[in-house]
A protein has these predicted regions:
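Beta-strand elements of repeat-based all-beta scaffolds
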Residues: 1-7, 11-28, 32-72, 76-93, ...
Length: 380
């Protein structure tokens, strides 16, 4: 069993198992730990998980390994029904929200119905390819296939798009809804080498022996792409002049990217913590001749104890901070010590009230979970 895996950047994933060989703990590269609990010594399926935030989720299973219920960290329960073939026939969520599924004798999904009785139907050909989706309002989207099962024609909203293939099964011609054409050419290794678009513009692509793109041509613009020994993109040139550069640290993390704009070198530098999380971005503009620094702006990022991003600190501005709960649902934001917005949510974590400044936005939903209304009110 896999107990650890270390990536090129030195970050490690670790796993622990019980005496029965079941996964009981997993440590992510950023140090976050997820624990797994089992209530049956004969089952390989966990009855509960607990993540680094302390959020606990529970599951129940049938004796055939089918998920019967899932309870999230807020106590919200989703239940599942299955038929004798193991196919899911219904999903029951909180607030009376349910979805029902029907299948044909071949086990293909043929209908999905919501709580209000709105039904979406599906049709197939004899080979089992999906040929039509009929929405509750009766609108129909269809797909036609050739003898090899490749889509040759799709119709959506009354508009049709068609595809042609070569003997190797590659798309060589695409006809859009307005009758315009795009054509494609490939090399013997199935790599795209030429594309002529709807507007008649032709783009060509060249690859090295390992499949990396090394040259592209677009209406007189010739771009060369360059890589290091780790196959990371290091720079590209356009018509012989450097256009962009990428640099990395010893862990392989991107440290900066730069390009030339109106003669000035514009760069963005990135900083990370030991867990690989982005901690800072610094943008700079340098003089074209002297390389003197003309302008810079830095933004820092911070994380809470659970590893969730919770602060953004721009230069010369108060920090922007957001408050979350559970698995990261947004509860509010503030600028410095000034509240910007607060959210109230229902049991399904849907926004029901948004308070910002002197205003409140209330949101209501139908029994089927669809947006029903929104009202903006002034508190004055």
């Amino acid at each position: 069993q896999l107990t650890s895996a270390t990536g090129p950047d030195g970050l490690e994933i670790r796993r622990e198992y019980d005496e029965l060989g079941r996964l009981i703990q997993e440590t992510a590269p950023d140090g976050d730990i997820t624990r797994y609990r089992y209530d049956n010594p004969h089952s390989d399926l966990p009855c509960a998980t607990e993540d680094a935030t302390g959020s606990r989720k529970t599951m129940t299973w049938s004796r055939y390994g089918q998920l019967l219920s899932f309870t999230d960290c807020s106590g919200y329960v989703t239940r599942y029904d299955h038929d004798r073939f193991g196919q899911m026939t219904a999903v029951h969520r909180e607030e009376g929200l349910s979805q029902y599924r029907a299948y044909d004798s071949r086990g293909q999904l043929i209908a999905v119905k919501d709580t209000q009785g709105h039904e979406t139907r599906y049709e197939y050909n004899i080979a089992g390819d999906l040929t039509a989706v009929i929405a509750p309002d009766g609108s129909r989207n269809g797909t036609q296939y050739d003898a090899w099962g490749k889509a040759i024609c799709t119709t959506q909203g009354g508009l049709t798009r068609s595809m042609e293939y070569d003997a190797a099964g590659r798309v060589i011609r695409l006809t859009s809804e307005n009758g315009s054409h795009t054509t494609f050419r490939y090399d013997v290794l199935d790599r795209l080498i030429q594309e002529t678009g709807f507007d008649g513009r032709t783009q060509r692509y060249h690859h090295d022996l390992t499949g990396k793109l090394i040259r592209s041509e677009d209406e007189g613009l010739v771009t060369h792409w360059h890589y290091d020994e780790a196959d990371r993109l290091t720079h590209r040139t356009v018509n012989g002049e450097t256009a962009e550069r990428w640099r990395y640290d010893e862990r392989g993390w991107l440290t900066d990217i730069s390009h030339i704009s109106e003669g000035h070198r514009v760069a963005v530098y990135y900083g990370y913590d030991e867990k690989g999380r982005l901690t800072g971005e610094r943008q700079t503009v340098h003089h074209p001749q002297t390389e003197a620094l003309l302008w810079q702006h830095e933004t820092r990022h911070a994380y809470n104890a659970q590893g969730l991003a919770n602060r953004c600190i721009p230069d010369s501005l108060p920090a922007v901070e957001w408050l979350t709960y559970g698995s990261g649902y947004l509860a509010g934001m503030k600028l410095g010590d000034t509240p910007l917005v607060e959210y109230t949510r229902d049991r399904l974590h849907r926004e029901t009230l948004r308070s910002f400044g002197r205003y409140e936005l209330t949101t209501a939903y139908t029994p089927a979970g669809q947006l029903q209304s929104q009202h903006l009110n002034s508190l004055l």
